[in-house]
Amino acid sequence: MKHTVERAVLRVALILLLGTVAQPVSRKLEARQHWWDLAQNELAAALNVRDNWNVAKNVIMFLGDGMGITANTAARIFKGQKMGMNGEEGYLTWERFPNAALLKTYNVDKQVPDSAATATAYLCGIKTNYYTLGVDPMVTLGDCAAGRNPLYHTPSILQWAQEAGKDTGIVTTTRITHATPGATYAHSAHRDWECDGNLGTMGIGCKDIADQLVHDNPGKYIKVILGGGRQAFGAGLGNELNTTCIRKDGRNLTQEWLDDKKLRGASASYVTNYGELSDIDPDETDYLLGLFADSHNPFEVDRLVGPNGSPSLKDMALKALKLLKKSENGFFLLVEGGRIDHALHDNLPHRALEEAIALDSAVAAVLKEVDMEETLVVVTADHSHVMTMNGYPDRGNDILGLVSDLSEIDNLPYTTLMFTNGPGYNYSVVEDKVVRHDPSTVNTKHIDYRSQAAVPTPPISETHGGEDVAIWAVGPMAHLFHRTHEQNYVAHAMAYSACIGPSAKNCQRPSHATFTRGPLAKPSVREPGSGRGSGEPKFPTLSPVLQQLLDDNQQKIVTALGTETVKSFSNTADVQELLGRSALPHSM
C-alpha cells in the first residue's frame, strides 16, 4: 500500500508540476474561484493539524534581528518577485508553520527595546533593562559591580540545554560577541563591553564578553561557534577598515580557546574562511570555532564566494547541524540573521531584504535535515524597525519601486518602503521652502539606495520600532505559541518543550496527549514496515517547487486519488514527510 500511495502521489504531483512548468509565469490577478478554493484548502489543512506532544530532543531557534512584521511582509513579496510572481501571494518558509503568535518586546525600562535586553528575554526568560545582557533588572546600564553579582545573572536556555546533557551551538552573521549570541553565555552590565578595550572606566573590574565566552560557563562548553568578530578576540587580520573593539591586553583568545580544549582532551578547530569550514570533518571534531571577519560578517550581497571568502548563513547553519546531530541527547542551536537589523538602521531596504532571504534559505535547508517529530523549530525577531509600507501601490508593484500616485502636497513620487526616522532624511531648502528629494531621479532598486525618512536621527542610525513581533513554531509543543505573549515567555516555552531548565522536573503532558517520539512515547500501533526506523529508505526530499505545488493543489490530489485513499495514509509519518517535508501542517 505504501509504495502504491507513494507512486500515486508523485504521479499526480508530476502532472501538476509539468502543467505548471509548461505555462509561463502569470502576473494576472486571480479570479473569484481562486480565492474560494484557496480558503477551502487552507481550512481543510487547518482542520487536520495535530498538536505534537513529544518531548523535544532538539531545539533550533532562528532569529531575524530587526525582522518586524513590515520587514517580514516586504521580504515575502521580494522573494516572490525574484521568482517572477506578483509576490504578495507567496510565503517565507516559516510562514507555513502551523503555529504562530505575537510577542511584546518592550524592556523593563524602555517602551522601544534594544537587542541585548530582548535577547535576555527570549533566551533567559527574564525581561531586563535596556542595553544590559544576561542580567536581571537589578543591574542598570553600566553598573559593573551589580553586573558581577552572580545573584543577578540569568542563565540561558543554552545553559539549561548543557545541564541536561545536550550539545549546543550558536551561529550568526554578526560578531559572536554581539547582543543576540552574547545573551546565550555572557552576563554584562553593558552590551558594548565586547572586549577589554571597550570597558572604559565604568567597566573596570568586569570581564569582557569575549573573555566570558572562552573561559566561563557555559561559553567554554559550546560545541559550535560560528560568526564574525575576530578583533574582540585579539585575532583580527587587519584587512578590514571597521575597528569596533580592539583588545588592549595583548591576548589572543582564539589560541586560549584552543588551549582549553586541548587541556580537556577534546579535538578542536579554529577556522577563518569558507574553505576551512568546508574541510571540517564533523566526525573528527568535538569543538568548532569559526570567526570569518574582524567585525561583522559581510552582507550577503557583498560576500566573497569561494574558499577564501565567507560562508553564508546557510553554510554555517548546516555545518553546525552536522556537528550537533552527533549528540545522543540532542542539542540546542541558535541561528541569527543579524544583518537585517544593520541594513534597516541605515535605511537600506534592499540590503535588509536580501539578508531576510538568506535567513529563509537557511531555515529551508535546516528543515530538510532534522526530524520534526523530535525537533522544535521557532523563527522570530527580537524587535522591529520603523520601516513602513505605504501608499496604494498596484498589485505586483516592485516592492523596492515607486508608488504610482504622487504626493498631493509636493507633487513628487515616493517609494513603497520608507522610514519614519533615520539617515534617509533628505530635504533641502529652496527659496525658504523645504523641498523633498525626488526619488524618481535615482534607482530606488539599487542595493545601496537609502529610502527617505521623515525625521533625522543622529548620528546616522534609524531607531528600532516598539510594536509586537511575530513568532512561528513547528515541532514538539509548538502549539504553546498561540496568542500574544510577553517576549520572555519564549524561553520558558522552549524549555518546557524539551523538559530542561525550569521544566526539567515539571513538563507533564496531559492525559489525552499522544506521543510518537521520546521518553513519553507509547508502543507504536502502525503497520509493520511503515514509517521511519523500519529500515526502509525515506522518501526523497521534495524540491521547493514541488512542495509548493502539493501545498497549493490539495483538492486536486484528493480528487485524483480519492478521499478514502487519502484518508488511509494522511496520518503516517512517511506521507506527512512527502506532502509536507514534516515541517508543515498536514495537507489533507
Model-derived regions, located:
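Heptad-repeat coiled-coil amphipathic alpha-helices that mediate oligomerization/assembly
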Residues: 549-557, 578
